């Protein structure tokens, strides 16, 4: 048995432990001396990299992309828009370190301008394997070390496996970015095992986690911009598998202005004081806009708000929120998930159109119809409201 008393460390173990520290001290001195002898430009570059400084030129490139997407709108999945955005980001800076939990082809996380990490060569992309929690834990370590902003991809449904790592990133205020694709019943035939229902709500419930769910290509660029700016916690991008129409081409906003930073903003309105305000995120914004167009023809007074980040909206000052929430007689929320978390907007007389059961297998358009998340449902609710 052990011959030592409680909390007594054997001398040989102490010696071994301290020898590791002494070796580390020597290596640290060698490294610091080398850095001090380096040219000022090298020292600045190293300091900027360690502190994860993003040069303004990166955001300028994103503004160029945003302007292009507004001028030539595309109907694409937001996961594809994210890939386009990442190519611009990975081209403009060496600070990003990507990866995926064996879903690279589906998450669209690897761009052609970065190479995988290997034993033989430096790279900026990690194939984590089917290990979502390990991916999250490794990204936390990368962020804590400094020098890189890690981003990793998986399906939104598998965020449950990442949850402890996401929570720790939030607790430690670490900048870690998750690319969570296949974000609703819109993923289609993979069925209820892969269709997230409660995930958006449960992730939003974690303090200091920013959940972004863009509804178009332009919003995807803006959400990536906010994720890069968010230095004090994890950012999660929930992205669609199905194509979504662009709705920002006709909105009179300067290309440099990012309305997503407010969490919610008006994308369509036919009245300063409408009967109904409809709030939606992600793919459901397209559905709501279709309903709005029909309701306008029927002379119903309606405003439509895109809510790309409910967390950001809830963090705005009370006056800002009240001006939006209290503007209409009744608020309607449309999201292909559960209603939890939308209470501040719904209030007592609000109407929620979304999910309360597991999904099903089938073409995504059939599923939206089956679960009654359609423009017809929205129109019917408004026309039949007292």
How does the language model describe each region?
Residues 79-88, 161-165, 221-225, 316-320:
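Short alpha-helical segments and helix-capping/turn motifs at coil-helix boundaries
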Residues 97-100, 128, 151-152, 178-180, ...:
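General beta-strand structural signal in soluble alpha/beta enzymes
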């Amino acid at each position: 048995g052990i011959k030592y008393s409680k909390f007594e460390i054997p001398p040989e173990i102490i010696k071994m432990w301290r020898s590791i520290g002494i070796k580390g001290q020597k290596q640290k001195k060698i490294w610091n001396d080398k850095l001090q002898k380096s040219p000022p430009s090298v020292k600045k570059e190293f300091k900027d990299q360690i502190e994860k400084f993003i040069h303004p030129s990166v955001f300028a490139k994103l503004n160029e992309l945003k302007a292009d997407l507004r001028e030539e709108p595309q109907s694409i999945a937001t996961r594809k828009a994210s890939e386009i955005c990442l190519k611009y980001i990975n081209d403009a800076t060496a600070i990003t370190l990507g990866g995926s939990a064996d879903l690279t082809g589906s998450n669209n996380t690897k761009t052609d301008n970065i190479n995988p990490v290997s034993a033989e060569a430096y790279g900026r992309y990690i194939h984590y394997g089917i290990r979502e929690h390990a991916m999250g834990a490794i990204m936390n370590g990368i962020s804590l070390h400094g020098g890189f902003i890690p981003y990793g991809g998986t399906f939104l449904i598998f965020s449950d496996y990442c949850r402890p790592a996401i929570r720790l990133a939030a607790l430690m205020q670490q900048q870690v970015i998750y690319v969570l694709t296949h974000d609703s019943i819109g993923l289609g035939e993979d069925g209820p095992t892969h269709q997230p229902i409660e995930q958006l709500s449960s992730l939003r419930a974690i303090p200091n986690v920013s959940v972004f769910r863009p509804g178009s290509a332009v919003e995807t660029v803006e959400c990536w911009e906010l994720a890069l700016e968010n230095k004090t916690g994890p950012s999660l991008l929930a992205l669609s598998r199905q194509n979504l129409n662009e709705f920002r081409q006709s909105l009179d906003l300067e290309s440099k202005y990012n309305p997503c930073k407010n969490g919610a903003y008006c994308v369509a309105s036919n009245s300063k004081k409408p009967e109904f305000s409809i709030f939606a995120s992600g793919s459901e914004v397209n559905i709501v806009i279709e309903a709005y167009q029909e309701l306008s023809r029927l002379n119903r007074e309606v405003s439509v708000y895109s809510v790309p980040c409910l967390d950001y909206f809830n963090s705005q000052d009370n006056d800002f929120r009240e001006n939006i929430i209290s503007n209409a007689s009744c608020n309607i929320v449309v999201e292909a998930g559960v209603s939890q978390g939308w209470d501040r907007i719904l209030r007592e007389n609000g109407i929620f159109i979304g999910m309360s059961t597991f999904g099903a297998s089938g073409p995504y358009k059939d599923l939206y119809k089956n679960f009654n998340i359609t423009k017809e449902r929205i129109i019917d609710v408004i026309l039949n409201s007292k």
